[in-house]
Amino acid sequence: MSSPTTAPHPAPPRLRVLVAARPALESRAVLRHVSSHLTEIELTGEPDAGPAPDAAVVCDDDVLAARLSASGVPVVFVASGGPPPGGIWPPSAVRCLHRPGWLAGQRAKGVHAVGTIAPPRAARARAARGAVVQLSTPDLDPADHAAVARAGAALRAAAEAARYDGKPLLGVVLDAPVPARSALLSAAGEDTDALPVVGVEEAATERLLAEASLLVSSPLLTAVNQAHAARVPLLLLPALDADQAGRLAGITEATGVGVLDAAAPDTSADRAVRAADPLWSRVSRALEHSGDDRRGAQRVARQVRQLLLAPF
């Protein structure tokens, strides 16, 4: 007598997590690093008309975080460049703060300070081929001619510094809205056909840094993390707004990273290259002293998994 066959159990539905970020260099970099540690989960982009996701990771987009929370989706909100403006956090199940161990700051109740959210260490090319520029102006309005002129001047000085050694620019990474990019490049006086421009949506910075001799960047915590991971010299651009001014002050006070002098870009770049080894030694010692193991991305990913197990 044959034994009855048992129907196979259907596979459990795969968990879906929405991942989204403000369209800014720092926000997208943090989201990219966190997402790389959630490979076993189905990650989706912007909300759609389909079933609600099981959870969400949102970097710096407080409007989206509040909307998802109101609709019943548990949210891990990540502040990528420091506490939100005014210290006002959006409604979310979990609040995570990206604050590297070398940066001083106060503890906030109900906030997980996760340490450094860093990119994976990448193999370096045998020889550097040139410099990389990243300029953060995510809110640039092409109709604001004064703001466009300031950003254009910053980009022009950054490009001059990047070419200090005669090597070509490997890439210029921008997060300016697409309608503002042509105005920005025009204000910088750059040949738009010759300049190797990539948008924030192309996630190019870490790939380019593998072959870079210098990173010239807006003052971003992620720029320090990226350059430190790649052991690439770093030169910061002057601040273009109040948020960048606060970040620039914190970074330079804590690490001593050099700031570009628009009147002497070549000298600024040369100084940054010569200061790179002592700079990264100081940063490494500060991370070790603070107990920061550069695993902040993994800590955020762990919060996501815990939310999936117990969302409320």
What do these predicted regions represent?
Residues 79-84, 101-102, 197-203, 238-244, ...:
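Short, acidic/turn-prone active-site loops that include or flank metal/cofactor-
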Residues 37, 147-166:
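Short hydrophobic signal-anchor/transmembrane segments that target glycosyltransferases
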Residues 222-282:
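Catalytic binding pocket for nucleotide-activated donors in carbohydrate/polymer assembly enzymes
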Residues 15-104:
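Active-site and donor-binding regions of nucleotide-sugar-utilizing enzymes
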Residues 177-228:
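Donor nucleotide-activated moiety binding/catalytic core segment of transferases
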Residues 2, 79-148, 173-175:
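A nucleotide-sugar donor-handling region in carbohydrate enzymes
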Residues 56, 214-215, 233:
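Hydrophobic acceptor-binding patch used for acceptor engagement in glycosyltransferases
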Residues 2, 6, 268-312:
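C-terminal amphipathic helix plus adjacent low-complexity
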